[in-house]
């Protein structure tokens, strides 16, 4: 092991893609606010799997239709490609079943010994994981009240948010 990379990781499932049924009314001289009809159309949900490199502050996203072991494995593959092969990647995460499933263990068995090290947060201790505050900020800044025309548009906007955040990472 040349370096020890530490990544704070979690999932944010059930991000709703919601579209308007009528166009928003723009502000005018009489009213300075955007008016939005209370009616909306649900287009489905997406799941976000994400990590923050605790040394560099870089946020690493994976948007998925599902929230399963295969998605978690896909995220591990992203980390594996991102960091030099001789480094150990320590991941701080919760006790979600996908993190210890047979499928995940089979994948980890194919990796060099010591490539991934999992550090589990205590039960009811998710607030100890830095990614949770990132998700909270993302919800306030970007997801709350968002309207899109398709799930694809929501996915694109999530990835764009990560690109913007990573221009000036906070560590």
Model regions: which residues?
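Extended, low-complexity cationic-aromatic segments
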Residues: 1-70, 74-77
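C-terminal anion-handling pockets and recognition modules
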Residues: 132-171
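Acidic/histidine-rich, metal-coordinating catalytic segments
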Residues: 87-99
């Amino acid at each position: 092991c040349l370096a020890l990379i530490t990544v704070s990781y979690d999932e944010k499932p059930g991000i709703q893609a919601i579209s308007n049924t009528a166009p928003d009314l723009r502000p005018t001289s009489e009213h300075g606010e955007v008016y939005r009809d209370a009616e909306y159309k649900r287009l489905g949900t997406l799941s976000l799997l994400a990590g923050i490199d605790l040394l560099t502050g870089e946020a690493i996203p994976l948007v998925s239709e599902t929230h399963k072991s295969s998605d978690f494995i896909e995220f591990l593959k992203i980390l594996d490609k991102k960091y030099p092969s001789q480094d150990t990647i320590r991941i701080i995460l919760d006790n979600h079943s996908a993190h210890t499933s047979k499928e995940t263990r089979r994948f980890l068995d194919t990796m060099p010994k010591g490539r991934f090290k999992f550090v589990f947060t205590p039960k009811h201790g998710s607030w100890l994981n830095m990614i949770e505050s990132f998700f909270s900020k993302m919800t306030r800044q970007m997801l709350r009240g968002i309207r899109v025309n398709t799930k694809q548009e929501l996915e694109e906007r999530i990835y764009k948010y990560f690109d913007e955040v990573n221009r000036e990472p906070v560590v």
